[in-house]
Swiss-Prot record:
<keyword id="KW-0862">Zinc</keyword>
<dbReference type="InterPro" id="IPR035500">
    <property type="entry name" value="NHR-like_dom_sf"/>
</dbReference>
<keyword id="KW-0479">Metal-binding</keyword>
<dbReference type="Pfam" id="PF00104">
    <property type="entry name" value="Hormone_recep"/>
</dbReference>
<keyword id="KW-0675">Receptor</keyword>
<protein>
    <recommendedName>
        <fullName>Nuclear hormone receptor family member nhr-52</fullName>
    </recommendedName>
</protein>
<dbReference type="InterPro" id="IPR000536">
    <property type="entry name" value="Nucl_hrmn_rcpt_lig-bd"/>
</dbReference>
<dbReference type="GO" id="GO:0005634">
    <property type="term" value="C:nucleus"/>
</dbReference>
<feature type="zinc finger region" description="NR C4-type">
    <location>
        <begin position="39"/>
        <end position="63"/>
    </location>
</feature>
<dbReference type="GO" id="GO:0003700">
    <property type="term" value="F:DNA-binding transcription factor activity"/>
</dbReference>
<keyword id="KW-0539">Nucleus</keyword>
<comment type="function">
    <text>Orphan nuclear receptor.</text>
</comment>
<dbReference type="InterPro" id="IPR001628">
    <property type="entry name" value="Znf_hrmn_rcpt"/>
</dbReference>
<dbReference type="GO" id="GO:0043565">
    <property type="term" value="F:sequence-specific DNA binding"/>
</dbReference>
<dbReference type="GO" id="GO:0008270">
    <property type="term" value="F:zinc ion binding"/>
</dbReference>
<dbReference type="InterPro" id="IPR013088">
    <property type="entry name" value="Znf_NHR/GATA"/>
</dbReference>
<keyword id="KW-0863">Zinc-finger</keyword>
Length: 338
């Protein structure tokens, strides 16, 4: 039997997929260093090869694509003092894998569909996705649409979200999609060692037409592009802290009085759980500074909320001044309801 990652001999399944010992060891190490990998080429190093590529980004991406999933603490990132610490390591590994899968899909697939928020929540399969090629050029507003879709898809996969009614999920994603997108984009920018947001293709997040409307007041554009990233840089947030923070942001039970009692109860339960894990993570890094570190991380929420308000203002101003420009329905939905 052949390893589904590197095509060498494989005798067993590791992390849920047929793989060799070398790829098993690589995946174990990669769950700690996932956020540091980059590809120097077009992120297709493992699609066709005769000599095993050295690209760690594409090797890890291939591991995810064949179904490898982190399910137990094979490697101790910290000194594990009790079962809570083991649960934390497992949780972080699974959150990282989920984040990695959806980010890889975001980069490698696109769609010409124009679904609304209601369409996606009712039936995600109506979003017809196509493999991205080098010839495909994606504009900034299209990246916003795709990023919003993949954030919704990522969080719809959580079991506790699946138990919610369609009405509750609509409220939850209407409020959270932009906030999660803002935080996620800023974190990727920070990990790429840049201080300003841009699209994955390296273009300006705002078109010249948008910038032209704010040529006399560019401060709001600069805030949107740099403010959250700047705060992440200031506190030197880690990828693990980000993974827990974005879950705390998502599981906010006080976003609307229209949420059902059961939805609020579920969100409160999970928000408390993720907050407890984040505080424990801070304790593992530095016992004495844990309360301060915990508060520093949570303070990002205020900056992120302000960033979303600025973005909505710019979007609505552009729609008023250039009404003939048609954004995707999903983008309009999340702007109006945020």
């Amino acid at each position: 039997m052949k390893c589904l990652v590197c095509c060498s001999y494989a005798s067993s399944r590791n992390f849920g997929a047929l793989s060799c010992s070398a790829c098993k060891m690589f995946f174990t190490r990669a769950t700690k260093n996932y956020a540091k990998f980059t590809c120097k080429y077009d992120k297709k190093c493992f699609e066709s090869f005769t000599i095993l590529p050295k690209c760690q980004f594409c090797r890890f991406k291939k591991c995810l694509e064949i179904g490898m999933r982190f399910s137990e603490p094979k490697q101790q990132l910290f000194n594990l003092n009790n079962s809570v610490d083991q649960d934390l390591i497992i949780l972080l590994g699974n959150l990282a894998v989920k984040d990695g899968v959806h980010y890889s899909n975001f980069l490698n697939f696109y769609s010409l569909e124009d679904p609304s928020m209601d369409d996606i929540l009712a039936d995600r399969s109506r979003m017809k996705l196509m493999k991205r090629t080098l010839e495909i050029k994606t504009k900034s507003h299209e990246w916003t649409f795709l990023g919003s879709y993949y954030k919704i898809a990522q969080f719809l996969d959580f079991d506790f979200v699946k138990t919610m009614s369609l009405a509750d999920r609509k409220i939850l994603f209407s409020y959270n999609t932009l906030r999660m997108g803002s935080l996620s984009r800023s974190m990727r920018t920070y990990l790429d060692k840049r201080d300003c947001l841009m699209t994955p293709s390296g273009d300006d997040l705002f078109s010249p037409a948008v910038r032209g409307l704010f040529d006399k007041t560019p401060e709001i554009i600069n805030r949107i592009l740099c403010q959250v990233v700047g705060r992440l840089m200031e506190i030197k947030i880690t990828y693990e802290e980000y993974l827990l923070l974005i879950m705390i942001v998502f599981c906010n039970p006080s976003i609307s009085h229209e949420l059902s009692d059961s939805a609020r109860e579920t969100l409160s339960k999970y928000q408390n759980m993720y907050a407890s894990f984040l505080f424990r993570f801070c304790q593992l890094k530095n016992q004495h500074k844990a309360p301060t570190r915990f508060n520093d991380i949570l303070s990002i929420c205020n900056v992120n909320n302000k960033n979303v308000e600025d973005y909505c203002f710019v979007h609505m101003m552009f729609q008023c001044m250039v009404p003939e420009f048609k954004f995707k329905k999903l983008v309009n939905d999340i702007i109006i309801r945020s």
